[in-house]
Regions:
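Conserved, structured core segments of small domains
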Residues: 1-143
Length: 143
């Protein structure tokens, strides 16, 4: 099972304040433990929302672009992990070990696997080009 762990940072981080080196060391130790256990698939930190944009769609289906920063900082994702584990309980156990250096909360979401969808959805989603791209990305991530 794959899970995405979304990290919601403190207001300081959203304002662009960098963490102190000790906090980074603690987070890297956690990341190394994830990697050694074979659970780490991917991770990244994100720039503050001031460098981003939000795209929503109006009732007519027209995209509306709003440049950051976003005032609702509790809704801003500051980073993520993708982990692969056997159960949700194992994923929760990993999340409880995340150093609280900058994270004010994390959200754990299971990632859909193609086999989670009904056969007709799998067939509709089958695209040789997309499948080849995903396989190439997964192969490069393993090397």
């Amino acid at each position: 099972m794959r899970f995405m762990v979304l990290m919601y940072p403190s207001e300081k981080a959203e304002q662009g304040v960098m963490p102190d080196p000790k906090a980074v060391e603690q987070m890297m130790k956690f990341n190394e433990e994830l990697a050694k256990a074979g659970a780490l698939v991917a991770l990244d930190g994100l720039h503050p929302s001031a460098k981003g944009a939000r795209i929503t769609w109006d009732r007519a289906g027209k995209p509306v672009v709003t440049d950051g920063p976003f005032t609702e900082t509790h809704e801003v994702v500051g980073g993520y992990w993708i982990i692969q584990v056997k159960t949700k309980e194992e994923a929760v156990a990993w999340c409880t070990r995340i150093p609280s250096t900058d994270a004010r909360k994390v959200e754990l979401r299971q990632i859909f696997e193609m086999t989670d969808y009904p056969a007709e959805v799998q067939k509709a989603a089958d695209s040789p080009e997309v499948r080849a791209t995903i396989e190439r990305i997964e192969k490069s991530a393993r090397s």
